[in-house]
């Protein structure tokens, strides 16, 4: 993975690198590989993730159809 450092701005380059790693799922994989996961625990985790994904898709579908209100956006203060 490669990140360009512009004008010796290392902080910005680190933020970009961290965002890229997050998108690629590197942090999740490193956490998963740090310790052995029993096959039964892996199945349970994957099943829970699948259920979570299905609920999220169903919720989004209902929101698109207008049966559920859209989530309220949180206004964050500007810098």
UniProtKB/Swiss-Prot annotation:
InterPro entries: Ribosomal_bS21, Ribosomal_bS21_sf. It comes from the Bacteria. GO terms for molecular function: structural constituent of ribosome. Residues 57-79 are annotated as: Disordered. The keyword Glycosyltransferase does not apply. One of its GO terms (cellular component) is ribonucleoprotein complex. GO terms for biological process: translation. Keywords: Ribonucleoprotein, Ribosomal protein. The keyword Magnesium does not apply. It holds the Pfam family Ribosomal_S21. HAMAP family: Ribosomal_bS21 (MF_00358). Belongs to the bacterial ribosomal protein bS21 family. This is Small ribosomal subunit protein bS21A. It comes from Rhizobium johnstonii (strain DSM 114642 / LMG 32736 / 3841) (Rhizobium leguminosarum bv. viciae). The gene is rpsU1.
């Amino acid at each position: 993975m490669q990140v360009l450092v512009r004008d010796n701005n290392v902080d910005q380059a680190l933020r970009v690198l961290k965002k890229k790693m997050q998108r690629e799922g590197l942090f999740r994989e490193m956490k998963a590989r740090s310790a052995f996961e029993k096959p039964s625990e892996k199945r349970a985790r994957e099943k829970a993730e699948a259920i979570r994904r299905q609920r999220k898709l169903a919720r989004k579908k209902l929101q698109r159809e207008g049966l559920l209100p859209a989530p309220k956006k949180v206004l964050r203060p500007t810098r």
